[in-house]
């Protein structure tokens, strides 16, 4: 289980409707998360942004 410092977030692709779920430390990462990950629908790496 995640502790109270961490929050489960959704990462949404900037180019398609693909999504990832991950955990973020709220104390260390106060801004919105932005990662480059593999998009399974487009079959290439794109930027995924944190969505609420």
Swiss-Prot record:
The keyword Hydrolase does not apply. GO terms for biological process: translation. Signal peptide: none annotated. One of its GO terms (cellular component) is cytosolic large ribosomal subunit. GO terms for molecular function: structural constituent of ribosome. Coiled coil: none annotated. Keywords: Ribonucleoprotein, Ribosomal protein. InterPro entries: Ribosomal_bL33, Ribosomal_bL33_CS, Ribosomal_bL33_sf, Ribosomal_zn-bd. It comes from the Bacteria. Pfam families: Ribosomal_L33. Belongs to the bacterial ribosomal protein bL33 family. HAMAP family: Ribosomal_bL33. PANTHER family: 54S RIBOSOMAL PROTEIN L39, MITOCHONDRIAL, LARGE RIBOSOMAL SUBUNIT PROTEIN BL33M. This is Large ribosomal subunit protein bL33. It comes from Chlamydia abortus (strain DSM 27085 / S26/3) (Chlamydophila abortus). The lineage of its organism: Bacteria, Pseudomonadati, Chlamydiota, Chlamydiia, Chlamydiales.
């Amino acid at each position: 289980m995640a502790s109270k410092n961490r929050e489960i977030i959704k990462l949404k692709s900037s180019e398609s409707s693909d999504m990832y779920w991950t955990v973020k430390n709220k104390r260390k990462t106060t801004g919105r998360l932005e990662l480059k990950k593999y998009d399974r629908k487009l079959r290439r790496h794109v930027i995924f942004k944190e969505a609420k």
